[in-house]
């Protein structure tokens, strides 16, 4: 087993697997498990192929450490400007959200231990702690992420051990909403749960000695792990509660509180899981932004650090809770970044490439030809329609 590639797949998974996973049953339970599972499989397939397209663009663009260089060498200056603007907007939104979420969680954990802490101090402490690992490079993040991911999956397994005995066939077969239009509207929410594209340029550069088959397997494994976790969690929650109960929860805390009444340890376990999910997501996104800043702005570590961590930290302090409403637009930004831009890059590259490219063992080309590209375009358009 190639542990470097396996670790890279876990970085992909850790970036996609966020605390938002806990909310998936609240969105899908009402539609029943059959259609929820089908939609999740379609979204996973679409995002995985789009990730493979970006992997192709990165592997065919030598010495590209960030999406800035990849865009410049594929879709020109205009495309590069659009890509960078969307990329920065998305990553800043994501980092601010993770800082806000992590700080709130840290404050709550310390309150349980009767230690009072201001939210501002918690934000600074989390950012300084997590950023220390990011500046050490992709190799350190890879090794740390493997450890964090192991503990995160362990917490999920413990939760399932507690929940599985309470599952009933009646709950698993329930459907309270037959409106397929409303189900379709949840597509973008699920899409953001599978999106790990910001880290792909860094991981392709990190695994520059990998063969094209290894790069493909890295992306596929990094997509399948979140899919399995989401489905298992969805089935466990739906099997224990009625759809009406789940859909009436206003936030994740209500869900956790309901399960806490059944088992006193589940609140602690899910709090640990949420903490680890936030940290792994932060590390992946921060790594992508840090490498992007090195690639685009400066190789000076101080300048890069300020642009990567201090600006989102200031944003978290200024925006506070109301900023979370802006994250609703992140799905639209992500459709362009994760679907349309990789598609444009690959179409441009394939027009220029020679037979030598196909014979090179280290240059990856996504399978499927023009049909797969057309289906990817349709997938992206449908995601945009679901937002209207």
From Swiss-Prot:
Keyword Cell membrane: yes
Coiled-coil stretches noted in the UniProt entry, renumbered to this chain: none
Alphabetical UniProt keywords: Amino-acid transport, Cell inner membrane, Cell membrane, Membrane, Transmembrane, Transmembrane helix, Transport
Places the protein is found: Cell inner membrane
UniProt entry tagged with the keyword Cell wall biogenesis/degradation: no
Record InterPro entries: Amino_acid_transport_2, Trp_tyr_transpt
Molecular-function annotations in GO: aromatic amino acid transmembrane transporter activity
One Gene Ontology CC term in the entry: plasma membrane
An example Gene Ontology biological process: amino acid transmembrane transport
Membrane topology: Multi-pass membrane protein
Chain ranges passing through the membrane: 5-27, 31-53, 86-106, 121-141, 147-167, 186-206, 218-238, 268-288, 302-322, 326-346, 368-388
A Pfam family per the record: Trp_Tyr_perm
Similarity comment: Belongs to the amino acid/polyamine transporter 2 family.
Annotated function: Seems to be involved in glutamine transport. Complements an E.coli glnP deletion mutant.
Protein name in UniProt: Glutamine transporter 2
Species of provenance: Aliivibrio fischeri (strain ATCC 700601 / ES114) (Vibrio fischeri)
């Amino acid at each position: 087993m190639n542990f470097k590639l396996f670790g890279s797949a876990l970085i992909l998974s850790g970036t996609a697997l966020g605390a938002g996973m806990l909310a998936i049953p609240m969105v899908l339970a009402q539609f029943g498990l059959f259609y929820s599972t089908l939609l999740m499989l379609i979204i996973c397939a679409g995002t995985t192929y789009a990730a493979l397209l970006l992997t192709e663009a990165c592997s065919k663009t030598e010495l590209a450490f960030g999406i800035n260089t990849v865009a410049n060498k594929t879709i020109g200056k205009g495309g590069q400007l659009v890509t960078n603007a969307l990329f920065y907007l998305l990553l800043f939104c994501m980092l601010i959200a993770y800082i806000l979420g992590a700080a709130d969680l840290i404050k709550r954990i310390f309150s349980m231990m009767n230690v009072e802490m201001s939210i501002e101090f918690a934000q600074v402490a989390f950012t300084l702690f997590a950023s220390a690992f990011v500046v050490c490079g992709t190799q350190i993040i890879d090794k740390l992420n493997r450890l964090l991911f192991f503990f995160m999956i362990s917490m999920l397994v413990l939760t399932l051990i507690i929940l599985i005995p309470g599952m009933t066939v009646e709950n698993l077969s329930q459907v309270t909403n037959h409106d397929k239009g409303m189900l379709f509207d949840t597509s973008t929410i699920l899409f953001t749960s599978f999106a790990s594209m910001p880290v792909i340029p860094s991981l392709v550069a990190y695994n520059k000695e990998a063969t094209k088959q290894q790069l493909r397997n890295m992306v596929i494994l990094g997509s399948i792990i979140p899919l399995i976790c989401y489905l298992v969690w969805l089935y466990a929650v739906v099997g224990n509660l009625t759809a009406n109960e789940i859909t009436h929860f206003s936030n994740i805390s209500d869900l956790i509180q309901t399960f806490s009444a059944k088992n006193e340890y589940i609140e602690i376990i899910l709090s640990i899981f949420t903490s680890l999910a936030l940290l792994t997501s932060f590390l992946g996104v921060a790594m992508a932004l840090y490498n992007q800043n090195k690639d685009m702005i400066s190789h000076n570590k101080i300048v890069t650090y300020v642009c990567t961590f201090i600006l989102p930290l200031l944003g978290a302090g200024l925006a506070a809770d109301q900023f979370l409403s802006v994250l609703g637009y992140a799905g639209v930004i992500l459709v362009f970044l994760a679907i349309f831009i990789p598609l444009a890059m690959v179409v441009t590259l394939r027009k220029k490439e020679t037979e030598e490219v196909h014979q090179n063992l280290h240059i990856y080309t996504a399978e499927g030809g023009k049909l797969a590209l057309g289906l990817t375009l349709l997938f992206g358009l449908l995601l945009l329609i679901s937002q209207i």
